Amino acid sequence: MSKINVNVENVSGVQGFLFHTDGKESYGYRAFINGVEIGIKDIETVQGFQQIIPSINISKSDVEAIRKAMKK
């Protein structure tokens, strides 16, 4: 089995980030696994990344806002 390297920075130095799309509300997170960008839409996954990588540093108020938007 190959090792999975979960991180918030890929080889080109572009960091993962929370994002919001105006118009139709859209919240999520972008991160990198083995240098490949992935988009994450589920808040539980975002929280999982937060537990694995504390430097993601998502505030509780942001988590609540994301949760609210995803229930729409």
Swiss-Prot record:
<feature type="site" description="Interaction with the host cell wall">
    <location>
        <position position="29"/>
    </location>
</feature>
<feature type="site" description="Interaction with the host cell wall">
    <location>
        <position position="30"/>
    </location>
</feature>
<dbReference type="GO" id="GO:0031640">
    <property type="term" value="P:killing of cells of another organism"/>
</dbReference>
<keyword id="KW-0578">Host cell lysis by virus</keyword>
<dbReference type="InterPro" id="IPR053769">
    <property type="entry name" value="PlyC_sf"/>
</dbReference>
<dbReference type="Pfam" id="PF20821">
    <property type="entry name" value="C1_PlyCB"/>
</dbReference>
<comment type="function">
    <text>Component of the endolysin PlyC that degrades the host peptidoglycans and participates with the holin protein in the sequential events which lead to the programmed host cell lysis releasing the mature viral particles. Once the holin has permeabilized the host cell membrane, the endolysin can reach the periplasm and breaking down the peptidoglycan layer. The small subunit PlyCB is responsible for the specific binding of the endolysin to the host cell-wall, probably to the rhamnose of group A streptococcal carbohydrates.</text>
</comment>
<dbReference type="GO" id="GO:0042802">
    <property type="term" value="F:identical protein binding"/>
</dbReference>
<feature type="site" description="Interaction with the host cell wall">
    <location>
        <position position="67"/>
    </location>
</feature>
<feature type="site" description="Interaction with the host cell wall">
    <location>
        <position position="60"/>
    </location>
</feature>
<dbReference type="InterPro" id="IPR048849">
    <property type="entry name" value="Endolysin_PlyC"/>
</dbReference>
<keyword id="KW-1188">Viral release from host cell</keyword>
<keyword id="KW-0929">Antimicrobial</keyword>
<protein>
    <recommendedName>
        <fullName>Endolysin PlyC, small cell-wall binding subunit</fullName>
    </recommendedName>
</protein>
<feature type="site" description="Interaction with the host cell wall">
    <location>
        <position position="37"/>
    </location>
</feature>
<keyword id="KW-0204">Cytolysis</keyword>
<comment type="subunit">
    <text>Homooctamer. Part of the PlyC holoenzyme, which is composed of 1 PLYCA and 8 PLYCB assembled into a ring structure.</text>
</comment>
